[in-house]
Regions:
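Non-catalytic cap/lid and distal C-terminal segments of serine-dependent acyl enzymes
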Residues: 1-239
Length: 239
């Protein structure tokens, strides 16, 4: 994982700050957000506009390798849900001055990382209240649903549904949760699923915005979407 600390942290290391947990797609690594996503430049520019204050960013690896996709879940392939919902928050609270208010915690990701962000928000709404889903899928998947359940969820439909955000939003209420769903205008392969998420999320009580950007399934879209989402998150955080 990689952690970004805003300038205000170095002036007052005890002042509590909001948190964004950020994920790449697959294949991808946390470093991609630094190089391809221009995260340091984006955050420094944001901090300069807010008297040095900005969220703490933890860019985490939810895959473990360049080829694996454990579907952001606790299965025989790994304990990714535990990592993102327990281990990462516990480390941040123990080592950095992060806010204890779930309203100041957000999770964000691109492609399968965007899917993961929505999975986490729907599984743990009392931990992360805000999210950015950039070009994510509607469901965790390794091809079709049958293969996904067989290979990704140990053959258990119950386990699949417990980690499928569309299923969870169809059966639960999320009035305290809010997010932005975004995609590239020419990203036709992902657009349909994101529109499905929008409809189901609004019915669950979530406050949802949809935003589109010129481009396809690319860093051009994701870096713009993240930068564009920061003011919205800052408002949610009360920065």
């Amino acid at each position: 994982a990689i952690v970004y600390l805003p300038p205000s942290y170095f002036k007052d290391p005890s002042a509590q700050l909001p948190v964004i947990v950020l994920m790449s797609g697959q294949p991808g690594t946390p470093q991609d957000w630094l190089v391809l996503g221009k995260l340091p430049q984006t955050m420094d520019q944001f901090a300069a506009q807010h008297d040095g204050r900005a969220p703490i960013i933890a860019v985490v690896d939810v895959y473990g390798s360049q080829t694996a996709n454990p579907l952001c879940s606790d299965t025989s392939h790994g304990k990714v849900a535990t990592y993102v919902q327990k281990d990462v928050p516990s480390w941040l609270r123990a080592n950095l001055p992060v806010s204890s208010d779930p309203g100041q915690w957000a999770i964000a990701g691109l492609s399968s990382g965007g899917t993961c962000a929505l999975q986490v928000v729907t599984r743990a709404p009392d931990l992360y209240r805000s999210f950015l889903d950039m070009s994510g899928e509607a469901h965790p998947q390794l091809g079709n649903e049958e293969r996904t359940i067989a290979d990704g969820f140990d053959g258990s439909r119950q386990l699949y549904e417990a980690n499928d955000p569309v299923h969870l939003m169809s059966h639960n209420r999320y009035e305290e949760s809010a997010g932005i769903i975004s995609w590239g205008e020419s990203d036709t392969a992902f657009k349909e699923g994101l529109i499905e998420i929008d409809h189901v999320a609004e019915k669950s009580g979530m406050r949802i915005e949809t935003r589109t950007y010129p481009g396809g399934h690319s860093w051009k879209v994701w870096s713009a979407a993240f930068e564009d989402g920061l003011p919205w998150l800052a408002q949610r955080f009360g920065l």
